[in-house]
């Protein structure tokens, strides 16, 4: 028995750096997995950021808030940032759970969903390039927001 203990101890001592590396790597992997949110939570966070970005735009359109080019730029940047990863947040298997409002049509009409996202991406980029003042804002933003609403009509289920 003593021989086995000595052999095991020598093995661990001689390979302690390897064992530490494996242990640290495993701990990092587990921590990363634990911190990673679900696709449903991730896409809900993106949609929440879109909602926050839309509020000042809608308020400016209604005359409830003075026009601010800085606020417009911030909102459009939020749209662009969220849209860049949005379509990746709908993997198969994330159709149900966690109070999702995602319509099954997202998966049955994946090409249409991706096309709607591409259209939004294009409209956001065009708005970023063209909005320079209140007049160009009022000429551009209503169509962009209408596109958001159309996507919600097609690809969102409200309880």
Where are these regions (language model features)?
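Aromatic (phenylalanine/tyrosine) cluster motif
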Residues: 3, 11-12
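Bacterial N-terminal signal peptides that target proteins for export
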Residues: 12-24
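Extracytoplasmic c-type cytochrome modules immediately beyond a signal peptide or single-pass transmembrane anchor
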Residues: 37-142
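The canonical Cys-X-X-Cys-His
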Residues: 144-155
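Short Cys/His-rich "knuckle" micro-motifs
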Residues: 159
